[in-house]
Amino acid sequence: MDIKRSNQGAGQLVGETAESGQQRYPGRFSRRDFEAIAERAVLREPGQEPGREGAARAEALGMALDAGVRVDGRRLWDSLMELAKIGATPKGGVCRLALTDLDKAARDLIIDWGQQAGCSITIDQMGNVFMRRGGRNDALAPVLTGSHTDSQPTGGRFDGIYGVLGGLEVIRTLNDHGIETERPIEVVIWTNEEGCRFAPGMTASGVFAGVFALDYALGLHDMDGKTLGEELRRIGYAGETPCRRRPIHAAFELHIEQGPILEAEGLTIGVVTDAQGQRWYEIEMIGQEAHAGPTPMPRRRDALLGASRIVQLVNEIGLRHAPLACATVGMMRVYPNSRNVIPGRVFFTVDFRHPQDEILARMNDELREGIARVTAEIGLEAKIDQIFYYAPVAFDRACAQAVRSAASRLGYGHREIVSGAGHDACYLAQVAPTSMVFVPCVDGMSHNEIEDALPEWIEAGANVLLHAVVDRASEPG
């Protein structure tokens, strides 16, 4: 599905007067300023080889950026706050579950903004939205950035959406300054990153990377039995473009850290070098429903008792492999859920994370051994389904260096960091050179309505993204 809207003045640089092409922006450079910088950079010495011109253009862009090109922090913040109204919750967060009407409204608004910025829009079979700004050579593989619009049921204003709007701000800023990159730049909205409505998460980026089959992903269903494919069609985001890997020159995802390290150390930028591996499980403990009064304690086959012991075991496993391990039981459903009936069945989830795959495997073994022991002691049955796994990710070193160099040039305090959360970038890294940019969030809080970030952090991360994206988008073929 391709969406194209004709805009008045198409082809004219944003902010440029038709008469002169020289309009200045407050505190910014005019187009003529940049042309002068570029002219100095591309002047050839006698006998200079022809292939040097593309490299010289890249150098010119670097000089221009170093000379003072920065994102409009106020515009980015205002865009974030406008999106936060869609699905706003009483405590200041958002509830914008994947492929609901609220998710559609967020996508619609961002697409409108993308078209106003001169982007062409493509939607693929998984509902992924690609907003493309052309380059000097559109045949070259693009530089990709973006994230997701869906949220947790009690999510925050920055998770995911910051990466999408930060990418859009990069395009707006390049338009403001009349900067043309050698390669196209694309901003993507990935479908169903969170996985709280349709599990597992990171679904559409997984299809793009070849991790999940298209039919499998479209057939995922929510608690009401609605499938992901049905909901894509309902909200008008079932595109026709194939969802599959294609050449990507480099990819960056801008995100809040979702942890406390950067804020605690007084740093502004996290250069993400790696991401933890994850295993998700759905577990069912099956016992025997019985009357809570007449049934003697020794004769009970209490499924909730067994599940409770496994919850404790999960916590012990996490502590055993601390400080790098994380182990969480996040969902539980008890049947028949009556106050005077001994539970006969309990469903719950387990989330294991660790940056070393061998430790993840050990945690898996300890969980299964513990479940076998508990079920034997209480007389229960257990069903264990590992629904999601990806190995720890090592991000591309050249992309990480682009982030590091940008942070250094801009004067932001930074450090290398490992992502504790899963992101679409983790799957994208399997098919394209990829890295991430982190900024702090207040008290390390995320997946919570009180998730917050300071405007100066938000602006800084977008500036680093701008420089990193332009660095890679300036590379010739």
Language-model region placement:
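Alpha-helical metal-binding/catalytic segments enriched in His/Glu/Asp
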Residues: L83, T145, T154-E193, R279-M285, ...
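N-terminal capping segment at the start of a domain
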Residues: A60-T100, Y390, H447
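Zn-dependent metallopeptidase/amidohydrolase metal-coordination segment
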Residues: L76, I86-T89, G146-S147, H414-V464, ...
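Active-site-adjacent substrate-binding region
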Residues: K85, T89, G225-T273, V311-E316, ...
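His/Asp/Glu-rich mid-to-C-terminal helical/loop segments that flank catalytic regions of hydrolases
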Residues: S30-D33, I37-A41, H291, T295-H321, ...
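A non-catalytic alpha/beta surface segment that caps or lines the substrate-entry region
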Residues: A88-G134
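Midchain, well-structured core segments that form catalytic/ion-binding scaffolds
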Residues: N192-E193, R197-E358
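A short beta-alpha structural unit
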Residues: A98-L99, T328-N337, T349-P355, E381-A400, ...
